[in-house]
Amino acid sequence: MVQHHTGALRMSEFVFDIGQPGVGALAKQIWRDQAQEIKAMGQWRKSWYPEAPVYPAALKTGGDPNSIESLERMSAAHIQAMQMMGSTPTRDNRVTWFLEGMIAHHGGALVMAHDALNKSTNPTIRRLARDIIVAQRREIIELRRMLRHDGLNKPEYHQFDALFSF
């Protein structure tokens, strides 16, 4: 999840200086929220799982989500995918790139939050997952509003709607 959040930080930085229609302000808010969550996740890892690796890790296919032995080091390609580093915007397309990219990013967060709800018994993790679902739903709706303002309304903007509820 930290790698996923790092992607949001990088994407947001491309549009900090954009004023229309509140894109820069939204990007700065997303950056602040994601940075705070990265810090919290780091503190939880140290407190709850001091023996867990500090390098980016993922659950092995079929692995037990409650076992550190089921973790494996993320490949460079996996890290790049989590950080959504597949493309770089141009000056002309960076607003649409950011808004569409954040819908995809938030959709990934919804998938991971539902996964956490399905697998975790930790009340703090479950609360975070529910908070993420509520926040991501709200932001996806705002991102779509901003895209509609620019005359864009593609079917893929709605691909995560089924994940808006618990």
Q: Could you tell me what each predicted segment is?
A:
Residues 2-166:
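All-alpha RGS (Regulator of G-protein Signaling) helical domain and cognate RGS-like helical scaffolds
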